[in-house]
């Protein structure tokens, strides 16, 4: 039976396979089959753990912050692999592996409480698609962040085209996630939008990326400014995901999850 006690085994194996894939990618001047194979294997290992944890908990592992970090690492591996296959950047797997590993290590050092309870509001048809679509969009935009940082410090203006494609895809999924969330909110709480702190930061993040898209389509802005905008938009995304939970104003948010067993059921919230 796969449970959270087994996570260190799957995490170590996944990260090891991803690192091997990154090394093969860096050592090859063309797209490496070994890099693709090792990366896919790492993704599959983490996917098996997620599926096993889902079976063990008898609920989708999407409720706690630790569980969303797990999905982020999984989707980050996929996003990095797709970027490598499409644009053949040898270094992208190294950075996507690093970003995935950071969240894996956080989960190893600060595991959440993973029980089987699921508050009534989370027992909704919108729960799984809303959270998974959001986490996939975060991962795609994470790759755009990697491209932006590399383009900024290596003075590679041509990377903007790749960043554009990643932002288009990421914002599309982000918008779908927001739409699904609003439908879920209407069903659970009677309002499509309540402007609580996390929702406010979601709009800030969304607007940051929309400004980037509009500047690329209609503006005459230098590549350095555009890369900086992408970096700050990604930082806003991190604030929306977990940073806002540390703000005093967020304590009454309908999205806040307090992962303590003794907390009463009405105060439990989803992390997205």
Short names for language-model regions:
Residues 261-272:
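Single conserved hydrophobic/aromatic residue that forms the stacking wall/gate
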Residues 1-19, 129-141:
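Hydrophobic transmembrane alpha-helical segments in integral membrane proteins
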Residues 24-31, 56-59:
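Short, hydrophobic transmembrane alpha-helix segments
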Residues 30-42, 90-97, 159-170, 223-230:
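Membrane-interfacial loop-to-transmembrane alpha-helix junctions, especially the N-terminal start
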Residues 17-24, 41-52, 73-80, 99-106, ...:
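Membrane-embedded alpha-helical transmembrane segments of multi-pass integral membrane proteins
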Residues 44-55, 101-129, 151, 171-189, ...:
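C-terminal ends of transmembrane alpha-helices
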